[in-house]
Amino acid sequence: MLEGYRPPFDATPIHRLKAAGGQLVGKTTMDEFGFGSFSTNSAHGVPLNPFDPDRSCGGSSGGAGAAACLIPGHIALGVSTGGSISGPASFCGVIGLTPTYGRVSRYGLIDYGNSLDKVGLLSRSAASIAQHFGTIAGPDPKDPTSCAQPPLAGKGRMPSSLALPREAMENLDPAVRKAFQGALPVLRGMGVAVEEVSMPSLRFALPAYYVLATSEASTNLARYCGMRFGRREEELNQHFNDFFTGVRSEGFGDEAKRRILLGTFCRMVGFRSRYYLKSLAVRQ
């Protein structure tokens, strides 16, 4: 859909990095519009895991995770709507920071779910993450959802705590569970207060996320119609519905089509209260 497109301006995080002396090396591959968890829905091929080419880099920011692992001294930017930074960081053995919504401006970002998208960082170094987070974070008059609170980087270590939801541990792979539990004494030794809590509503998180994210995606991606945005090969001398259908059928990948259709279904008059409004209630 965006083949050959070159942005006419920099997104705010890129602008701030350049202003601080950073150099943009390139763009990394990812799932189309962020739709995926394994970077297999990319128009540019599937990125290979740095440790085992037969395994996944995660997604949707899989290329960013691989690049952060393979290129020492560099950072990579990623966008998380539902795990697209933490997933690749885990798969590629690097550190991923998914900031709180609003801490980093979304101006210039192609929206997936505009109430869920967060711009974050991946790197092999926690110090590098902290340094560059201080560069890209902060309020932006071009993004009304950005937070006015200044970044924490540079203020020294603050007392920290970790809440461990019991429900999140129920279906873990045994090896993952063992590694995670082995890290808890280390954290406690560093002064982190670890408290086990119960979050019964956690089991509704994934279905609620899918309904809300795809609903927002279906509206955000409506602009790619071949007239305002998007690649166009269809002739304009036809009925709008035929033109619109042709452009979107050819331009979007299979996963993008599935999520657009699901989001449109959830927002229809006959199903809005059953799915979309209930998901909003779960989120609140």
How should each PLM-predicted stretch be described?
Residues 1, 41, 45, 52, ...:
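Charged, often glycine-rich, active-site loop that binds/positions anionic groups
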Residues 1-13:
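Enzymes and membrane/adaptor proteins characterized by extended Gly/Ser/Thr/Asp/Glu-rich
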Residues 10-12, 172-198, 229-231, 241, ...:
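Acyltransferase
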Residues 15-136:
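Short glycine/serine-rich loop segments
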Residues 22, 99-102, 121-127, 134-142, ...:
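Generic secondary-structure signature for well-ordered alpha-helical cores
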Residues 95-183, 239-246:
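A short helix-breaking turn/cap at a secondary-structure junction
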Residues 144, 149, 159-166, 197-210, ...:
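Flexible, acidic loop-helix segments that line cofactor/substrate-binding pockets
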Residues 156-163, 215-284:
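Short helix-loop capping/hinge segments that flank enzyme active sites or metal/cofactor-binding pockets
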